[in-house]
């Protein structure tokens, strides 16, 4: 099997329509009182780089917009219990969020997220990771349900959650790209 070095893949991305700005697709709809959101992006990175960013629980607030803190409380088997605090904003409205989530890691395919406790009525979903047909090219997606515990008009809720999830997902993709570029730079300098 032909193995193409990661720096070659990263260097060629502009030729294939990929840029340093994340190309994120987002779809949302109201379902059974909750907002269902799907986000997806194609990322040129190693599996390890992607997985390390997704599971860097203590540093998520450094690169996820709207997240003020994220702290790994403990692991129980392959389940990480993570405390997160932040807010979702849309126009003049701000929804404070404080949750403890269970991140159920099914390496290498997915991380399922379930609400353990907090200020949301419902949070269930997760990340899916699939190879995009080439070495070091991946489809990363997040899909799930979110329902605030306070009553908010549906037209505001859907926009609030969709915009917030887009920003958070883009933050994750940008961090993966940043880590990939750091590896590429380090590898390139070690060859000199």
Regions found by a protein language model. Give the residues of each.
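One face of beta-strands
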Residues: 22, 35-41, 84-86, 97-99, ...
